[in-house]
C-alpha cells in the first residue's frame, strides 16, 4: 500500500497513505540500507523521503519497515449502495453527497462495464453502482444515511 500510495475510497476524508507515513527503513538498488523519518509526528527539513517513496512503486527502494500514524476506528460505518447505469447520474449523486452536510467518509463508482454478475459484498449486480460511506456514532450515521436516501 505504501509503495503504491494506495488510499482507497476514504482518501478525501482521512488522507492518502503518504500523509500517515512517519518513517521507514528500506534497501535501495545497491543493497544499502536507508532510514528516514522516525516514530513520531514532526516537521521535516529538506527532502521528505517518506513522501517521495510513497507512490514510487518500489523503484527507489524496497521498504522493509514502516512507522505509520493510525486513526481511531469509527464506532460504526454504513455504505449506501445506489444502482445507476449512467455515469452522469453517478457523478452528480457523488458530487451532491460530498457538498451536503452528511459528511461522507468515502465514495466509489463502479461503472456498468463490469458486465453482468458483478459481485460486491456477496450481492450480484448487473449495472453501475455508486457507494457512499458514512462513519461515526450510530445515531449520527443513521440520520445521515436517511438524509441521503
Question: Where are the regions that the model predicts?
Answer:
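Noncatalytic alpha-helical scaffold of FAD-dependent oxidoreductases
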Residues: 1-149
